[in-house]
Amino acid sequence: MAYQAGGERAAGVVRGAGTAMSGLLPISYDEEKVIGEALALQVLARYHGVYDKPQLTRYVNLVGRAVALTADRPTIAYHFAVLNHDSINAFAAPAGYVFITKGLLKQIRNEAELAAVLGHEITHISEKHVLAVLQRSKQLAGISEAGLSAAGHNPVVFKSLIDAVAKKLLDEGLDQGKELEADRLGVAFAARVGYDPQAYVGFLQRLRTLKGDDQAFFKTHPNFSSRIAETQQGIRALSPPRQGALLADRLTQRLRGQL
Protein backbone atom coordinates (compact mmCIF):
# COMPACT_ATOMS: atom_id res chain seq x y z
CA MET A 1 0.00 0.00 0.00
CA ALA A 2 2.99 2.26 -0.22
CA TYR A 3 2.29 5.66 -1.68
CA GLN A 4 4.45 6.07 -4.78
CA ALA A 5 4.11 8.80 -7.38
CA GLY A 6 7.01 7.74 -9.60
CA GLY A 7 6.52 7.21 -13.31
CA GLU A 8 4.46 9.03 -15.89
CA ARG A 9 1.28 7.01 -15.33
CA ALA A 10 1.39 7.36 -11.55
CA ALA A 11 2.09 11.07 -11.80
CA GLY A 12 -0.87 11.40 -14.15
CA VAL A 13 -3.13 9.59 -11.71
CA VAL A 14 -2.01 11.86 -8.87
CA ARG A 15 -2.72 14.90 -11.05
CA GLY A 16 -6.14 13.49 -11.83
CA ALA A 17 -6.83 12.77 -8.18
CA GLY A 18 -5.88 16.29 -7.19
CA THR A 19 -8.13 17.77 -9.87
CA ALA A 20 -10.99 15.45 -8.93
CA MET A 21 -10.62 16.33 -5.26
CA SER A 22 -11.03 19.98 -6.16
CA GLY A 23 -14.60 19.13 -7.13
CA LEU A 24 -14.04 19.78 -10.84
CA LEU A 25 -14.39 16.15 -12.01
CA PRO A 26 -15.78 12.84 -10.72
CA ILE A 27 -13.14 10.66 -9.10
CA SER A 28 -12.17 7.66 -11.23
CA TYR A 29 -11.35 4.30 -9.66
CA ASP A 30 -7.62 4.75 -10.41
CA GLU A 31 -7.73 8.11 -8.65
CA GLU A 32 -9.73 6.61 -5.80
CA LYS A 33 -7.00 3.99 -5.33
CA VAL A 34 -4.31 6.67 -5.02
CA ILE A 35 -6.38 8.54 -2.43
CA GLY A 36 -7.29 5.33 -0.61
CA GLU A 37 -3.73 4.05 -0.42
CA ALA A 38 -2.49 7.37 0.91
CA LEU A 39 -5.22 7.53 3.57
CA ALA A 40 -4.62 3.88 4.48
CA LEU A 41 -0.99 4.70 5.25
CA GLN A 42 -2.17 7.44 7.59
CA VAL A 43 -4.38 4.96 9.44
CA LEU A 44 -1.50 2.50 9.78
CA ALA A 45 0.83 5.20 11.07
CA ARG A 46 -1.70 6.47 13.62
CA TYR A 47 -2.73 3.04 14.91
CA HIS A 48 0.62 1.25 15.28
CA GLY A 49 0.53 -0.69 12.03
CA VAL A 50 -0.83 -4.13 11.20
CA TYR A 51 -1.24 -6.68 13.98
CA ASP A 52 1.12 -9.49 13.00
CA LYS A 53 -1.22 -12.47 13.24
CA PRO A 54 -1.58 -13.94 9.72
CA GLN A 55 -4.18 -16.51 10.78
CA LEU A 56 -6.36 -13.79 12.29
CA THR A 57 -5.91 -11.60 9.21
CA ARG A 58 -7.01 -14.45 6.93
CA TYR A 59 -10.12 -15.03 9.00
CA VAL A 60 -11.13 -11.35 9.00
CA ASN A 61 -10.55 -11.23 5.23
CA LEU A 62 -12.70 -14.32 4.64
CA VAL A 63 -15.61 -12.81 6.55
CA GLY A 64 -15.13 -9.33 5.12
CA ARG A 65 -14.85 -10.40 1.50
CA ALA A 66 -17.97 -12.55 1.78
CA VAL A 67 -19.90 -9.50 3.01
CA ALA A 68 -18.32 -7.22 0.39
CA LEU A 69 -19.62 -9.46 -2.41
CA THR A 70 -23.16 -8.48 -1.40
CA ALA A 71 -22.42 -4.73 -1.34
CA ASP A 72 -23.09 -2.19 -4.06
CA ARG A 73 -19.52 -2.27 -5.44
CA PRO A 74 -18.61 -5.98 -5.28
CA THR A 75 -15.88 -5.78 -7.93
CA ILE A 76 -13.54 -3.69 -5.76
CA ALA A 77 -10.51 -5.57 -4.42
CA TYR A 78 -11.19 -5.28 -0.70
CA HIS A 79 -8.34 -5.58 1.81
CA PHE A 80 -9.03 -6.13 5.51
CA ALA A 81 -6.39 -5.62 8.19
CA VAL A 82 -6.27 -5.79 11.98
CA LEU A 83 -4.58 -2.81 13.61
CA ASN A 84 -2.19 -3.35 16.51
CA HIS A 85 -4.10 -1.00 18.79
CA ASP A 86 -6.23 -1.52 21.90
CA SER A 87 -8.74 1.23 21.16
CA ILE A 88 -12.24 0.21 20.06
CA ASN A 89 -12.46 1.43 16.48
CA ALA A 90 -12.62 0.62 12.79
CA PHE A 91 -11.91 2.64 9.65
CA ALA A 92 -12.45 2.56 5.91
CA ALA A 93 -10.39 4.22 3.19
CA PRO A 94 -11.51 4.55 -0.44
CA ALA A 95 -10.85 1.74 -2.92
CA GLY A 96 -11.42 -1.09 -0.48
CA TYR A 97 -9.18 -0.63 2.58
CA VAL A 98 -10.87 -1.69 5.82
CA PHE A 99 -9.21 -1.64 9.24
CA ILE A 100 -10.40 -3.00 12.58
CA THR A 101 -8.45 -2.64 15.81
CA LYS A 102 -7.61 -5.64 17.97
CA GLY A 103 -9.35 -3.72 20.76
CA LEU A 104 -12.60 -3.83 18.82
CA LEU A 105 -12.15 -7.51 18.01
CA LYS A 106 -11.94 -8.21 21.74
CA GLN A 107 -15.47 -6.80 22.11
CA ILE A 108 -17.00 -9.02 19.42
CA ARG A 109 -18.89 -12.11 20.61
CA ASN A 110 -19.84 -13.92 17.40
CA GLU A 111 -19.11 -13.96 13.67
CA ALA A 112 -22.40 -12.23 12.86
CA GLU A 113 -21.26 -9.20 14.86
CA LEU A 114 -17.93 -9.20 13.04
CA ALA A 115 -19.69 -9.40 9.67
CA ALA A 116 -21.91 -6.43 10.50
CA VAL A 117 -19.00 -4.32 11.81
CA LEU A 118 -17.09 -5.00 8.59
CA GLY A 119 -20.29 -4.36 6.63
CA HIS A 120 -20.50 -0.92 8.25
CA GLU A 121 -17.02 -0.06 6.98
CA ILE A 122 -17.69 -1.63 3.57
CA THR A 123 -20.69 0.69 3.25
CA HIS A 124 -18.45 3.74 3.67
CA ILE A 125 -16.53 2.47 0.62
CA SER A 126 -19.42 1.21 -1.50
CA GLU A 127 -21.39 4.43 -0.97
CA LYS A 128 -18.27 6.60 -1.42
CA HIS A 129 -18.77 8.42 1.88
CA VAL A 130 -15.16 9.56 2.26
CA LEU A 131 -14.96 10.63 -1.37
CA ALA A 132 -18.10 12.70 -0.86
CA VAL A 133 -16.38 14.52 1.98
CA LEU A 134 -13.38 15.20 -0.23
CA GLN A 135 -15.45 16.52 -3.11
CA ARG A 136 -17.97 18.59 -1.18
CA SER A 137 -15.78 20.26 1.42
CA LYS A 138 -14.17 23.40 0.04
CA GLN A 139 -11.97 24.15 3.01
CA LEU A 140 -10.87 20.82 4.48
CA ALA A 141 -8.63 21.64 7.41
CA GLY A 142 -8.20 25.17 6.08
CA ILE A 143 -7.04 24.10 2.62
CA SER A 144 -8.39 26.37 -0.09
CA GLU A 145 -9.71 25.47 -3.54
CA ALA A 146 -6.39 26.64 -4.96
CA GLY A 147 -4.59 24.20 -2.70
CA LEU A 148 -6.80 21.37 -3.88
CA SER A 149 -6.10 22.23 -7.50
CA ALA A 150 -2.36 22.47 -6.86
CA ALA A 151 -2.38 18.90 -5.57
CA GLY A 152 -3.02 17.77 -9.12
CA HIS A 153 0.38 19.05 -10.23
CA ASN A 154 2.59 18.54 -7.20
CA PRO A 155 2.83 15.17 -5.38
CA VAL A 156 4.26 16.92 -2.31
CA VAL A 157 1.20 19.16 -2.11
CA PHE A 158 -1.00 16.11 -2.68
CA LYS A 159 0.60 14.32 0.27
CA SER A 160 0.17 17.39 2.47
CA LEU A 161 -3.48 17.49 1.50
CA ILE A 162 -3.92 13.81 2.31
CA ASP A 163 -2.28 14.40 5.70
CA ALA A 164 -4.77 17.16 6.47
CA VAL A 165 -7.77 15.16 5.24
CA ALA A 166 -6.70 12.11 7.25
CA LYS A 167 -6.38 14.20 10.39
CA LYS A 168 -9.89 15.53 9.92
CA LEU A 169 -11.42 12.15 9.18
CA LEU A 170 -9.58 10.25 11.92
CA ASP A 171 -10.17 12.89 14.56
CA GLU A 172 -13.75 13.89 13.73
CA GLY A 173 -15.25 11.06 11.69
CA LEU A 174 -18.06 11.17 9.16
CA ASP A 175 -21.39 12.88 9.77
CA GLN A 176 -24.38 11.29 11.45
CA GLY A 177 -26.29 10.57 8.26
CA LYS A 178 -23.45 8.57 6.77
CA GLU A 179 -22.86 6.65 9.99
CA LEU A 180 -26.53 5.71 10.30
CA GLU A 181 -26.61 4.64 6.66
CA ALA A 182 -23.52 2.50 7.25
CA ASP A 183 -25.22 0.81 10.22
CA ARG A 184 -28.36 0.10 8.22
CA LEU A 185 -26.70 -1.12 5.02
CA GLY A 186 -23.88 -2.94 6.80
CA VAL A 187 -26.41 -5.12 8.61
CA ALA A 188 -28.29 -5.72 5.35
CA PHE A 189 -25.10 -6.79 3.56
CA ALA A 190 -24.23 -9.21 6.37
CA ALA A 191 -27.78 -10.59 6.40
CA ARG A 192 -27.53 -11.37 2.68
CA VAL A 193 -24.62 -13.69 3.47
CA GLY A 194 -26.76 -15.48 6.06
CA TYR A 195 -25.77 -13.79 9.32
CA ASP A 196 -28.27 -12.84 12.01
CA PRO A 197 -28.87 -9.07 11.66
CA GLN A 198 -29.96 -8.77 15.29
CA ALA A 199 -26.41 -9.58 16.37
CA TYR A 200 -25.31 -6.04 15.51
CA VAL A 201 -28.00 -4.59 17.77
CA GLY A 202 -26.56 -6.60 20.64
CA PHE A 203 -23.08 -5.36 19.78
CA LEU A 204 -24.18 -1.71 19.83
CA GLN A 205 -26.04 -2.23 23.10
CA ARG A 206 -22.90 -3.70 24.64
CA LEU A 207 -20.83 -0.71 23.50
CA ARG A 208 -23.45 1.65 24.92
CA THR A 209 -23.12 -0.09 28.29
CA LEU A 210 -19.33 0.03 28.06
CA LYS A 211 -18.91 3.62 26.88
CA GLY A 212 -22.15 5.37 27.84
CA ASP A 213 -24.81 6.57 25.42
CA ASP A 214 -23.32 10.02 24.86
CA GLN A 215 -19.79 8.72 24.23
CA ALA A 216 -19.84 8.21 20.46
CA PHE A 217 -16.57 7.33 18.73
CA PHE A 218 -16.34 10.86 17.27
CA LYS A 219 -18.13 14.08 18.12
CA THR A 220 -19.94 14.02 14.75
CA HIS A 221 -21.28 10.48 15.29
CA PRO A 222 -24.82 9.76 16.47
CA ASN A 223 -25.20 8.33 19.97
CA PHE A 224 -25.66 4.61 20.45
CA SER A 225 -29.41 4.84 21.08
CA SER A 226 -29.91 6.52 17.71
CA ARG A 227 -27.75 3.91 16.01
CA ILE A 228 -29.64 1.06 17.66
CA ALA A 229 -33.01 2.53 16.63
CA GLU A 230 -31.84 3.06 13.03
CA THR A 231 -30.43 -0.46 12.85
CA GLN A 232 -33.65 -2.00 14.18
CA GLN A 233 -35.67 -0.02 11.66
CA GLY A 234 -33.42 -1.31 8.88
CA ILE A 235 -33.80 -4.89 10.10
CA ARG A 236 -37.60 -4.58 10.07
CA ALA A 237 -37.39 -3.41 6.46
CA LEU A 238 -35.43 -6.47 5.32
CA SER A 239 -37.41 -8.58 2.87
CA PRO A 240 -37.86 -11.40 3.50
CA PRO A 241 -37.30 -11.11 7.27
CA ARG A 242 -33.91 -12.55 8.22
CA GLN A 243 -32.85 -14.58 11.24
CA GLY A 244 -29.56 -16.10 10.16
CA ALA A 245 -26.60 -17.54 12.02
CA LEU A 246 -24.49 -16.17 14.89
CA LEU A 247 -21.52 -18.58 14.64
CA ALA A 248 -20.22 -17.73 18.10
CA ASP A 249 -18.28 -20.98 18.43
CA ARG A 250 -16.50 -20.44 15.12
CA LEU A 251 -15.42 -16.93 16.10
CA THR A 252 -14.18 -18.19 19.48
CA GLN A 253 -12.18 -20.94 17.77
CA ARG A 254 -10.64 -18.59 15.20
CA LEU A 255 -9.72 -15.94 17.78
CA ARG A 256 -8.34 -18.33 20.38
CA GLY A 257 -4.72 -17.41 21.10
CA GLN A 258 -4.81 -14.57 18.55
CA LEU A 259 -5.61 -11.63 20.82
Label each region the model flagged.
Residues 1-259:
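A Zn2+-metalloprotease active-site environment signal
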